[in-house]
Design a protein with these regions (language model features):
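A contiguous active-site-proximal alpha/beta segment in oxidoreductase catalytic domains
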Residues: 122-184
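N-terminal Rossmann-like dinucleotide-binding module
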Residues: 2-73
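Beta-loop-alpha module in the N-terminal Rossmann-like domain of NAD(P)-dependent dehydrogenases
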Residues: 6, 20, 46, 75-133
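Hydrophobic residues in well-ordered beta-strands that form the structural core
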Residues: 117-118, 142-144, 266
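C-terminal helix-rich "cap/oligomerization" subdomain common to oxidoreductases
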Residues: 1-28, 91-93, 316-356
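C-terminal glycine/acidic-rich active-site capping loop/insertion
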Residues: 147, 261-332, 356
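Rossmann-like dinucleotide-binding domain that binds NAD(P)(H)
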Residues: 181-250, 254-256, 332
Length: 356
């Protein structure tokens, strides 16, 4: 499940008291009326998935820039969030540029619409807190679209860590790199990409960040950063490392979790999970054994059922609105991730370690 994780001092959806669920809707016979604002690179995929998800009906779309991907179909392309609200919605999906997240989300909260906002929740943590508070005060489900939590490799990894198959977790490393995306213009690589790794690391490890230290660079001619390297520490002494950029001529999405029994390697491009076990047979070549520190053991590649992560994300949001289950990424979690993102940017600009 692309589920939330209970962290000390960080609210999750485990306690749903005060939330006004739509328990009589979200079925094939009585679907949720869904509005989508933002018909760009992500919005077009959300439109496709919403239409294919049982219990959801796409009834309205909006984008002031029009419908360049032709996803509206027979629906009129509305000019703004207020026209979208006037269509009569149960839920909404926000896929506009990050700079507009706060204004659009607050309008939807004011109208009483359960909403999922694409990551990050807002352009900064203060705005994110305002958004999260608006939904909480009105008893609405507010979710953030961290779709990597629904990746089959990371879901399987989380389940195996929870089962204790790795023993004590020592380290989480992520690599997320590829060519420059033409779709991004309002944020840098930290808020666009590294935010995924920050969220999934805390989720997989079940622990909060306590400190980060980072470096960024600007090589593509834009004001925002396009390359980042960061290290950090989680509660319990788990060390983390993130390598993220838009300057690599190939795509890579890898998460490596190392612990007392070996290492898990999750490839989120392919959805594959591999386990490299610590060996139990001692090496007779003393120099090699001393160099490796641990011996090489069995390598296991798991057979994992694979469904589209975006479909699982929409189903989780639908079920949260219905009150059936609580597996979505909460807005409180989205704010916590943005706190770490801002700490990364502060660390890079001030050349110091930032405590959280």
């Amino acid at each position: 499940m692309c589920e939330n994780v209970a962290l000390d001092g960080l609210a999750t959806t485990t306690d749903t008291s005060g939330v006004h669920h739509l328990s009589d809707k979200g079925t094939a016979d009585n679907p949720l009326r869904v509005g989508l604002i933002g018909l760009g690179s992500m919005g077009r995929h959300h439109a496709r998935v919403i239409r294919a998800t049982e219990g959801m009906e796409l009834v309205a779309v909006a984008d002031p820039g029009g419908d360049r991907f032709g996803v509206a179909g027979e629906l009129p392309v509305l000019p703004d969030v207020h026209a979208l609200i006037d269509a009569g919605l149960d839920t909404a999906m926000v896929a506009v540029p990050t700079v507009y997240h706060e204004d659009v989300a607050l309008a939807l909260a004011e109208a009483g619409v359960h909403t999922m906002v694409e990551k990050p929740i807002a352009h900064d943590a203060a705005a994110g807190r305002r958004v999260a508070a608006a939904f909480a005060e009105r008893g609405l489900v507010g979710a953030v679209g961290y779709v990597e939590r629904c990746n089959p490799a990371l879901r399987a990894l989380r389940e195996r860590l929870d089962a204790g198959e790795l023993g004590e977790v020592y380290q989480v490393l992520t690599r997320r790199q590829g060519p420059f995306p033409a779709r991004i213009s309002d944020v840098g690589v930290v808020k666009d990409l590294a935010t995924h790794d920050i969220d999934l690391t805390a989720w997989v490890a079940g622990a909060r960040y306590t400190s980060v230290a980072a470096q960024v660079t600007h090589r593509s001619g834009r004001q925002t950063e396009d390359m980042m390297v960061a290290t950090g520490l989680l509660e319990g002494g788990i060390i983390v490392g993130h390598q993220v950029n838009w300057l690599t001529p190939f795509k890579e999405r890898v998460t490596i979790v190392t612990g007392e029994k070996g290492s898990f390697v999750a490839d989120t491009l392919t959805g594959d999970l591999t386990f490299h076990a610590n060996g139990t047979v001692a090496s007779t070549w003393d120099q090699v054994a001393a160099f490796r520190g641990v011996s090489e053991g069995d390598v296991i590649r798991y057979a994992i059922p694979k469904r589209e992560p975006l479909a699982l994300e929409q189903e989780s949001f639908r079920d949260a609105v219905r009150g059936v289950s609580q597996r979505h990424v909460t807005m409180a979690e989205g704010v916590a991730t943005l706190d770490v993102v801002e700490a990364v940017l502060t660390s890079a600009s001030e050349n110091r370690t930032v405590e959280l």
